[in-house]
Each structure stands twice: as structure tokens, then as C-alpha cells.
Amino acid sequence: MFLKRYKKLIALSSVILISCFLLLAIYGKVFHPSEKLKKLEYWVSFFEIFFISSLFIYRYNWYIWVITALIFASFAGYSIFWYSIKLPCACMGTLIPHASLLYFFLDLIFFVLSLSVTYLLQVKLSALYFWAFLGCIFFLIGYAFAEKVYQKFILL
């Protein structure tokens, strides 16, 4: 198959694309943090820096792409919660306000991209269905986490 021949190039390109958006998110969280979520945003930024490093190091291993898919599924759940209550998700701090739906679609695209790279790295299609199902569960976990954050930090 044409794509499998270029799987290493596709994996590297995917890492670069995802990293660009995550670096923008880190910049927004560190230099333009939401006042009520400042501590959470610093911790998430630290995690995202570690995550970008892991992506670059292990980009040719299928398991990092499964982890990436699950992370973006939970990010999608987080951002859709904020969109549903008409508040910004602060996914990039206050750098780009009121764009929760944009972040949801970006997270969804990165979820699908991660599963696609997982498939290119020789994971069977049946296993991919399992990871997609698990991604739906992580979507719900991200949604529940956002609701908890809303109750604890915003409704004070």
C-alpha cells in the first residue's frame, strides 16, 4: 500500500503537526492563563511538554499513538463540555477565547490521525476498533473531568 511505504514520514509529519498545536496551547496556558484555572493550566502545560518529547522519541512505536489517541479523546470531551455550557475551555489559556468548538474539532482530528498512524504502524484493524471504543470512554472521562473543574473552580 502506498501509505505504508511512507509510514515513517507520515508519523514524523503527524508529530510535527500535533506538536505545533500543543506548543501554541502551552504558550497560551503559560503566558495567558485563565485566572481561575492558573494552577491546573501550569500542570497541564508541564504534561504537554513531556508528551511532546515522548512523541518525538517514540514516534515509530504504535503504543505512543494509542496513548495519543486516548489523550486527544479526553481533550475532546473536555472541550465539548465547555462548549455545551457556552464558556471557553481555556485550552490555550486566554490567548484564543471562546473557541471551544474549534478545539473540539482539532482534538477529534488528532484522535483520528493518531489512530490512523497506529494502523500504519502494523496494528490490526480489530485492535483499532478496541482503541476507538476506549477513546469513546476517555471522551466521557474528559467530559466528566471538565464538569468537576467547572464545579470546583468556576462555581466558587
Label each PLM-derived region with a short phrase.
Residues 1-156:
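Membrane-interfacial helix-loop segments of redox and metal-homeostasis proteins
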